Amino acid sequence: MTDRSQPSNLRPPDDLDGWDPAWSRFVDAPDHAGTPRRWHLLDTGPADARRTILAVHGNPTWAYTWRHLAAAVPGDVRVIAPDQLDMGFSERTGVHRRLALRIDDLLALTDSLELTGDVVVVAHDWGGPVALGWLERTFAAVDSPIEITGLVLTNTAVHQPPEASAPTLIRNARRPWLLPRATVDTTAFLRGMFELSNPRTPAAVRRGYLAPYGSPDRRRAIAEFV
């Protein structure tokens, strides 16, 4: 794995509300196919922490979701929150990454990071299925250096029966004529997330969530996640 810390136009602005620029880390690590990809991580360090919290975001967010968690943990606890590939400030790969690929990607990343020891997994939204898939594979590896000591899931799905339909909002968003307009051509899907928030999302926080998604090319994976 190679750190890529050189300045880039595609890094979180230093003045985002609640964001510490020192948390940003760029690394080159493989994806599911072994292709080197550029990942952006929220990483509080240190590498020898007594516990690591692996935090996995959902859609349409990025590691900014975990800013309060990163600020609250004691100094001997490390938070690692990757921007999933094609999301946040991580590389746009041009590959439609379905759930199985995202699980493989996360496994490849944690292997490259040489994650070991006491690990608590925290996940939100689509990060839940990705994190649970990662957990299942990690538990199945008899020689894994990782000891899972906790799991926190928020606003996610653990299991959906085959006959169950998606929530109304998601079903509507998936309509072929609406999906690209709401998720790629515009920021409507992102802004809809804010409108569902109670209390209302402050403008400074909205700016934080919107920061990586300023153009249609950077929003394509939002549609693919839906």
Language-model features, listed with the residues they occupy:
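Conserved catalytic-core motifs of eukaryotic protein kinase domains, centered on the activation segment
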Residues: 65-67, 90-96, 162-165
